[in-house]
């Protein structure tokens, strides 16, 4: 029994080695060729019916005094080449090494520095600012290194659009900028008239334009979770002495505080993905594939404020400022304004009336008009 079994196994193994033409008559009816190919990754996405260029960020940027190169796979280190007269600013604890003759963190000759971060799932992107376009860094930990004498970085907080500018940094001037993101970084370029909606946790930086990003909420199935309050009760119950005394107790206040915390937590963990940003072109957006948690971007007050608003744009488009009146319109009197002569205006400037007080030796006081002769 063992020999026929070995022969069968040997015959099966030799059949697998034979070319397809030799065993076509034997296994053509039993097997089928399946071809597996990689899908093309160069197909552009589409936005508003047009092709949206989503490309990888550049690996190098160069100015007259410095050069940034992203090295490693997947982009785990930043190489900075500096001239003798250039300054380099990095985040604390990110400097890996420095080549060259450096004395007290300064050098009279060109040096090359290596900059990296501790997280193993980050990638770098470099941006060259030529002074014509300013950038807004949306993430608090995205700014890694920068160089440039005229480059200025200023923290900004916009009260009208705090969701987009929470923990943001405005970058202006000329120089090189190195950004770090979680996962991979990609660049999205929008033309004039195009719109793009993206989650705020995935936005690393974007170019500043006349159309700033606005908060946007998608429509989805929601469960209304309301905190019970005294205002929801009938009027005669609110005016009762028992209800008023109970609302002043520490037990009632602690219960209401607990309900508010549960509501805020549910909005941040369950319905937090409804908060998005809408960008209007022309602009360039740098996106990261792995976004942080929503509590690292929004405060509890902002989460509750956005969650209570209806779907769609939470802030309308910027209205044009009212036209200022011209000089001719300002000089023309309005119908409701009273007409005044030149004498009336002079009298208003000088006062309603002028009197000169004269005191005699007897202690009497005489009042005379200005310019009146005795």
Swiss-Prot record:
Give me the stretches of Basic and acidic residues compositional bias. Answer: 319-328
Cellular component, GO annotation? mitochondrial inner membrane
Q: Which Gene3D superfamilies match?
A: Mitochondrial biogenesis AIM24
Region described as Disordered: 308-342
InterPro entries per the record? AIM24 (IPR002838), AIM24_sf (IPR036983), Trp_RNA-bd_attenuator-like_dom (IPR016031)
Q: Which GO terms describe its biological process?
A: inner mitochondrial membrane organization
| Pfam families (UniProt xref) | AIM24
Compartments in which it is found: Mitochondrion
Transit peptide location on this chain: 1-11
Recite the UniProt keywords alphabetically.
Mitochondrion, Transit peptide
Task: Name the cystine pairs.
Answer: none
Q: Which SUPFAM superfamilies match?
A: TRAP-like
For the keyword Transit peptide, the answer is: yes
Q: Per the similarity annotation, which family is this?
A: Belongs to the AIM24 family.
Protein name (database record): Altered inheritance of mitochondria protein 24, mitochondrial
Which organism encodes this protein? Aspergillus terreus (strain NIH 2624 / FGSC A1156)
